[in-house]
A protein has these predicted regions:
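Bacterial N-terminal signal peptides
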Residues: 14-28
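Short coil/linker segments at helix-helix boundaries
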Residues: 33-44, 51-63, 73, 81-142, ...
Length: 408
C-alpha cells in the first residue's frame, strides 16, 4: 500500500477504528455466559467486576489476581487481569473518552506514556493467555471456549497496539484475528451470543468505511455490513450475557455515529442506571446531548454529574473530562464566561494528562480572545505550547499568537 493510500485509509477509518477498540469503556469482554461457569462465578471474580464497572481498577485487580491464583491455567482468568491492567492505564490517561475519537487523527496522537514495567506485564499476560488457549485448541480445534478466550486476548492486544504503540497494521492484524475466532465460535455454536459483540462491531466498522476504502479492504479479504453489525450488537445486548454491556455501549456509539441520538440515549441511560458508579457512562449522556445539539440539556446533565462527584457518587472520576464537556456546551450556548471557567477547571485538574490540559488551555485562549482579553489569551496560548510544542494544538496556538481567535 502506498503512503498516500495508507493516509487515506487512516483518515477514513480513524473514528471507526477508535470506536472498535474502545467500545467497552472498560467493561468486561473476557468471559462468556454461554461457556463453562467454573471460574467466574466465585466471589472474588464477582467482586472484581463490581469494582471494574465502577472504574475502581486497583480493587478489581486485587480480586482478579487472587482469582487467577486459584485458576492459573484458565485463559479467561488471565484475560481478566490483562483487561484490568490495560484499561486502568487507558483510563488514567483519559484514552476512554469516546467524544475525543471524533477528532481527526486523535487515535494516533493521544499519548499513553505507560511505564515499561506495565508494558512488559501486558505483553506477558497476553502471551500467557494466548498460550493457554492455543494449547487447548491443539488438543481440540473445535474447543469453543478456547476460541472465545483467544479472541478476547487478541482484541485486547489490538487495543494496546493502536492506542499505546500507535501501530495501525499490528492492531488491524490482531483485530481481524479476534473477529475470525469469534466467527468460528458462532459457526460452531450459533447460540453463543457473546461472540456477536466483536463480530458485530467489525461488521459495522468495515461497512461504514468510504466506498474506495471499503473496496481496498475487500481486496484484502476484509468485508462488513453496517446493518448486520447493528443487528448483531442489538442481539448480543438483549441476550444478557457477559458482553451485553459491551454490545449496548458499542451500539450506542454507532447509533450516535449514525445520528440516531434518541435511540443511543435510551441505551446510555439504561447503562447509567445499571452501573450507578460508572463515571464514564454518566458522562456519555452529556456527550450525546451535546452531539445532538441539545446544549442546555447537556450542560444540565454534566452539572448534575459534577455535583454527584462532589458528593462521592463516582469514586474514580476524572473531573477534567466533565469540565471540558461543560465548557463546550456553554460555549455553544454563547455563555463565554461560564465556558472559560469550565475550561480553566479542566486545565487545572490534578488528574488531567498533559495533552488534555493542553487542549483545555487552547480553549481558554480562544474564549479569552472572544472576550477581548488579549493578554490572558496570549498567556494561555503560550502555556499550551509549552506542554508539547509539536502537537496540533500547539500549531493552532501559535497561529493565534499572531492573530487573535475570532471564532469559527
Amino acid at each position: 500500500m502506498t503512503p498516500y493510500r495508507f493516509a487515506r485509509f487512516r483518515r477514513s477509518g480513524n473514528l471507526l477504528l477508535g470506536l472498535v477498540l474502545v467500545t467497552t469503556l472498560g467493561v468486561n469482554l473476557s468471559w462468556s455466559a454461554n461457556g463453562p461457569k467454573k471460574a467466574d462465578f466465585d466471589a472474588l471474580t464477582r467482586a472484581g467486576w463490581e469494582h471494574f464497572y465502577s472504574l475502581e481498577y486497583d480493587l478489581a485487580l486485587h480480586d482478579f489476581e487472587k482469582a487467577l491464583e486459584a485458576h492459573p491455567d484458565d485463559a479467561a482468568a488471565v484475560n481478566h487481569v490483562l483487561d484490568t491492567v490495560l484499561y486502568r492505564e487507558l483510563y488514567k490517561y483519559n484514552a476512554l473518552d469516546t467524544r475525543l475519537y471524533a477528532r481527526q487523527g486523535y487515535i494516533f496522537s493521544k499519548q499513553v506514556p505507560m511505564d515499561e514495567a506495565v508494558k512488559r506485564r501486558i505483553k506477558d499476560l497476553s502471551e500467557r493467555a494466548l498460550s493457554l488457549s492455543d494449547n487447548r485448541l491443539k488438543a481440540n480445534p473445535r474447543d469453543v471456549q478456547a476460541l472465545y478466550n483467544r479472541g478476547i486476548t487478541e482484541g485486547l492486544r489490538s487495543t494496546y497496539l493502536v492506542i499505546v504503540d500507535h501501530s495501525w497494521f499490528g492492531a488491524l492484524h490482531w483485530a481481524l484475528a479476534a473477529r475470525h475466532d469469534h466467527e468460528q465460535v458462532l459457526k460452531l455454536r450459533p447460540d453463543w451470543s457473546d461472540a456477536k459483540t466483536i463480530v458485530g462491531v467489525h461488521n459495522f466498522v468495515v461497512g461504514s468505511l468510504t466506498r474506495p476504502v471499503r473496496l481496498m479492504a475487500g481486496i484484502a479479504g476484509i468485508h462488513g455490513d453496517k446493518n448486520k453489525g447493528l443487528r448483531l450488537l442489538a442481539e448480543a445486548g438483549k441476550a444478557g450475557g457477559e458482553t451485553s454491556t459491551d454490545a449496548r455501549m458499542a451500539l450506542a456509539l454507532f447509533l450516535r455515529r449514525e445520528g440516531r441520538f434518541e435511540e443511543a440515549l435510551v441505551i446510555v441511560r439504561t447503562l447509567k442506571q445499571q452501573y450507578p458508579r460508572n463515571f464514564l457512562f454518566a458522562l456519555e449522556e452529556g456527550n450525546l446531548l451535546y452531539a445532538e445539539g441539545k446544549h442546555e440539556e447537556a450542560a444540565s446533565s454534566v452539572r448534575e454529574l459534577l455535583s454527584d462527584c462532589k458528593h462521592g457518587k463516582y469514586p474514580n472520576a476524572h473531573l477534567e473530562i466533565a469540565y471540558f464537556t461543560l465548557g463546550q456546551t456553554l460555549r455553544a450556548e454563547g455563555k463565554l464566561n461560564g465556558a472559560l471557567a469550565a475550561f480553566q477547571s479542566a486545565a487545572s485538574s490534578k488528574t488531567s494528562p498533559p495533552d488534555d490540559r493542553q487542549r483545555a488551555l487552547l480553549a481558554e485562549g480562544e474564549i479569552s480572545d472572544l472576550l477581548a482579553n488579549r493578554q490572558e489569551a496570549l498567556l494561555e496560548y503560550r502555556a499550551a505550547i509549552a506542554l508539547n510544542s509539536t502537537s496540533d494544538e500547539a500549531q493552532t496556538a501559535r497561529k493565534y499568537l499572531d492573530k487573535p481567535y475570532k471564532g469559527n
